[in-house]
Amino acid sequence: MIDQVLADWAPVTIATVVICFLADYVLTHLGAQAARGVRDRWSIEGSYEMNPTWERQIDSGRWFSWRVLFVAASLAVLLGAVRLLVQPGLFGLGPAFFGFAAGLILLLQAPVLIAHATNLQTFRDLADPTAVQGGLHFRRWYVYRQGASYVLRFGILWLLLWIPSQQAFFIGGAVSCLLWARRMAQLGEAARPSAPETMELGLGAPEDATPAASTIP
């Protein structure tokens, strides 16, 4: 039983959550640096970071941030508190409650880390001048929509895995992925220009566009 194992090994589960969060942060910085090196071949408008909450932090190029440490510590404390709630005889909550909480974070981070790995490999390949001819510039709304579709597929996968397993871990992942996909879709709609504005913009990429990748930190 996945939920039971996660609860029994709560310290390992909590450490994994924190490590995944920090890995996401580090890989986002690495991706932003790599993207700048291939901006003449591949770029999108706006920030490399697709989560508005972290855009300024990534754009600043500063690696150290008390905010990052605060979020990492908060995740550990919250999951630790949830684990205490599922102790036998307390509040009547079973290990499924902890499994759900762990799934909310870990199964959202899974597609995010996969996207980071894909982006870094793409930028490495594009660093070869013979890899492509010309360049491609993506509008931000389109990348948001692609990100929403990407995370949605994982949400459906976790839901399908829950059906035979009946483990709350997968329900947690499905909930977080579906909610994040909805958020990305909303951001995409907000960023999409009107039809007349789109015609005025033309096909060229703006010179001041910041390279980015479809990451979901």
Segments (PLM) and residue ranges:
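Hydrophobic alpha-helical segments at protein termini of multi-pass membrane proteins
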Residues: 2-217
